[in-house]
Amino acid sequence: SAYGSNRNKTPNIDRLAKEGMIFHRAFVTNSICAPSRAVILTGKHSHLNGQLTNGMRFDGEQQTFPKLLQKSGYQTAMIGKWHLKSDPTGFDFWQVLQGQGPYYNPPMNTPDGVKRITGYTTDIITDVTLDWLKNGRDKDKPFFIMSQHKAPHRNWQPGPKHLNKYDGIDLPEPETLRDDYKNRLSPAATQAMTVKNHLSANDLKLRAPGNLTPEQKAKWNAAYDPKNKAFAEAKLEGDELLKWKYQRYVKDYLRCIDSVDENVGRILD
């Protein structure tokens, strides 16, 4: 991959790096979702743009770089994950997920109200993006588009095409999987994000998502029910349970990445 990983292949994300720009020393001023988005939009630190944490309503009256692009003659669009509560401003077109948004069948906010779409969210965001690029813009004007995916956010629900990918293989474990956080600053030990202790039944796909269509649920259950049955019968404990949790987590994560990579390729093509 562009950053040297050999666990999975991401040819389209790698193409972005090859044909665009890659950062080896990139930093954020606020690492959680909504504040980081606000910093990108405004170019201001969180205490100046007002978005200090998740759950706050972004002040869309302030200056943002999409507004400056509009003033310079660009058509602008925002599609996908917004997560800032207020409606997007500075965009000629927008269609955004509500809050975090689900992985399947997302309701999407638009200037005309809520639009409900059936399908896998990563594919849908790309579909809307391509439709605007082909049919929604003035092709005589320059354009700027923010096409922002939910994936691979927790709880890592793979798309229907990838539900069984990586089955039958063991992916390498990271050296930090059994980290005891000794001699580390306290936040490292107090965070609630360990594979061992903090993955829920939903994270581990021990039950199907509740918002699937009958067809989607049938595909989901066909993929996960046999694996979950084998897990229940194994009655794993201790380190063997940790190993199982890691494999379930990392495979679902990479399955989500595969969908993102495919859809990046659709846009680039």
Indicate where each model-derived feature is located.
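Formylglycine-dependent sulfatase
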Residues: S1-D269
